[in-house]
């Protein structure tokens, strides 16, 4: 029998109906005892530190790659500890790579080197334990959501499913949103430190590090993009980033009317002709407001801010298999009682 989570109540439907919305509890701030710190050799000669777990089983198992947030590193637990708790309980392998740390240095912030660090973390994990290559998953919120979308576009061949929450789609655009009257705030300053300059629209270095530059290559990847509708007001990333990201990967016939994005953000009301999302109990109290699907890509805007709903994210990923049709129905989800960790 797989071990139960200490902070995540995992049970099957016999003990708790999946349709029951759950009351949120604070996310854990420490890694589970089973998680260890490791050093992963990098192709540039450096050593990438990471948090790691693999069950003792010699059978092939899913691998979850958890991506740290904008200002965090491999060692930062917070809501990312929920990813680890899930893996311990479900018998998955887990790696939480550093990919050059917080996003205020040139090697970080979605650089080629940071992208390669994630690729090499996956390769290293496969050397340590038997990994089911049809079940390699990627998850992140905020800066981790940015990197998740970037990895979906840069290396679509790896992932069985990518869950990206409140991610930045365009670095130059986000810099502009965090510059008021010519004065950059801390996030804009981080970007300037990483790039070596203040980017303007069309800046090639900022564009290369932006998911919009490559998301069209992620069309074959099951990609779940989610964003709280209060983000940008009670949070640092306006949900218009999710709308643009969705359109970047969606087929032309499935794209949303980009002319309505600003109206939606300003009013927080659905534009004419946009239908309310159907119920999705996996979101608990963070009720979906709008949902749209095109091919393997789904957009969900929910009642929330700059945060991830772990229950929805992890249960959706668990349904996906590389090479098989995407699965959107998660009505038989495993309930979690830890939700709502924001990304920083």
Question: Over which residues does each language-model region extend?
Answer:
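N-terminal cap/lid segment of alpha/beta-hydrolase-fold proteins
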Residues: 20-58
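Short beta-strand/loop motif that positions the catalytic acidic residue
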Residues: 225-227
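Catalytic active-site module of serine/aspartate enzymes centered on a nucleophile-bearing elbow/loop
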Residues: 291-343
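Active-site-adjacent alpha-helix of alpha/beta-hydrolase-fold enzymes
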Residues: 196, 229-295
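Alpha/beta-hydrolase active-site loop
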Residues: 109-129
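Short substrate-entry loop that stabilizes the transition state in hydrolases
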Residues: 59-61, 67-107, 171, 233-235
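Primarily recognizes the serine-hydrolase "nucleophile elbow" in alpha/beta-hydrolase
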Residues: 124-128, 133-183
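Mobile cap/lid helix-loop segments that gate and shape the active-site cleft of serine hydrolases
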Residues: 71-76, 160-161, 167-168, 172-216, ...
């Amino acid at each position: 029998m797989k071990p139960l989570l200490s902070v995540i109540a995992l049970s099957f439907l016999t003990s708790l109906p999946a349709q029951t919305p759950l009351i949120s509890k604070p996310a854990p701030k420490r890694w589970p005892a089973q998680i260890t710190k490791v050093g992963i050799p990098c192709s540039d000669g450096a050593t990438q530190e990471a948090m790691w777990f693999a069950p003792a089983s010699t059978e092939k198992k899913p691998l979850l790659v958890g991506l740290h947030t904008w200002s965090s590193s491999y060692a930062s637990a917070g809501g990312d500890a929920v990813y680890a708790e899930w893996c311990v309980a479900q018998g998955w392998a887990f790696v939480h790579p550093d990919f050059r740390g917080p996003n205020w240095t040139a090697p970080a912030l979605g650089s080629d080197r940071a992208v390669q660090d994630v690729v090499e973390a996956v390769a290293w994990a496969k050397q340590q334990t038997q990994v089911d290559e049809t079940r390699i998953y990627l998850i992140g919120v905020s800066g981790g959501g940015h990197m998740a979308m970037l990895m979906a576009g840069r290396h679509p061949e790896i992932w069985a499913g990518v869950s990206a929450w409140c991610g930045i789609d365009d670095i130059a655009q986000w810099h502009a949103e965090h510059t008021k009257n010519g004065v950059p705030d801390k996030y804009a300053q981080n970007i300037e430190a990483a790039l070596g300059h203040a980017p303007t629209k069309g800046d090639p270095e900022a564009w290369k590090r932006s998911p919009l530059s490559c998301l069209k290559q992620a069309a074959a990847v099951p990609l779940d993009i989610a964003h709280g509708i209060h983000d940008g007001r009670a949070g640092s990333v306006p949900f218009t980033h999710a709308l643009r990201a969705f359109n970047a990967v969606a087929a032309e016939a499935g794209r949303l009317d980009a002319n309505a994005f600003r109206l939606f953000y300003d009013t927080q009301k659905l534009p004419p002709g946009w239908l309310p999302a159907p119920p999705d109990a996996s979101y608990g109290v963070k009720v979906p407001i709008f949902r749209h699907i095109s091919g393997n890509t789904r957009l969900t805007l929910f009642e929330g801010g700059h945060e991830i709903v772990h229950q929805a994210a992890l249960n959706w990923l668990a349904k996906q298999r590389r090479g098989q049709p995407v699965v959107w129905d998660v009505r038989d989800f495993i309930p979690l009682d830890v939700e709502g960790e924001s990304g920083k």
